[in-house]
Amino acid sequence: MKRRTLDLLFSIGGLGLAVLLLVVGVVLTTNANFANNYVHDQLAAQHISFKPAGQLTDEERKSACLREYAGQQLTTGKQAECYANEFIGLHLTSIAGGKTYADLGEPQTALREQVAQAEQAKAANLADLQKQLADVSAQRDTVFKGETLRGLLLTSYGFSEFGRKAEQGALAMYLGAALLLLLSAAGLVHAVRTPANAAFAAPEQERITN
């Protein structure tokens, strides 16, 4: 095979692959932009803002991201992760001592049974049991709302991470396409400069030894 033909084949193939990488890069960029814009719009619509730096409690100040985002509106995936884990997570721990919505179900049910029995028996501690039930019910309701919001924010963070990964993939595609374009251009230049009758890896003539 002639060297020029081989150069042209590799160069054209490289150009085709570069175009393919560019197309994949554009698709990934489009998906990344959609993910980022969607997360931004959904979070911005909730009108959630971080506490100003001057209003942070001692426990909240221990969080680097709460200090970093202090006073800002929550609009990005990283901010959502911070708010969910460092702010909501902290306050959920203080509300019920780290117990979850499911954990509080058993004591709530037990107190309901005790209240029902106390009402039938007209027990003297009925008012105290009713207060305990009201407190546990309020805690469980608050924890449920907090866990729900925390879960939604972490879902937004996860969605934004898909967008970030797509951006990284798009960058890799663009760099790969640029490299292939350069190599293909070099191959075309070499093909033009190569004599038309030049062969690729022509066999060496045998040496005649006396």
Question: Which residues does each predicted region cover?
Answer:
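Hydrophobic secretory-pathway targeting helix
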Residues: M1-Y38, V189-R193
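Juxtamembrane interface at the cytosolic side of transmembrane helices
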Residues: K2-I12, F162-N210
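Juxtamembrane extracytosolic/periplasmic "stalk" immediately C-terminal to the first targeting helix
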Residues: Y38-A45, F200-Q205
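Long, solvent-exposed extracytoplasmic domains/loops
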Residues: I48-E147
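Short, aromatic-rich amphipathic segments at membrane interfaces
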Residues: A127-G176
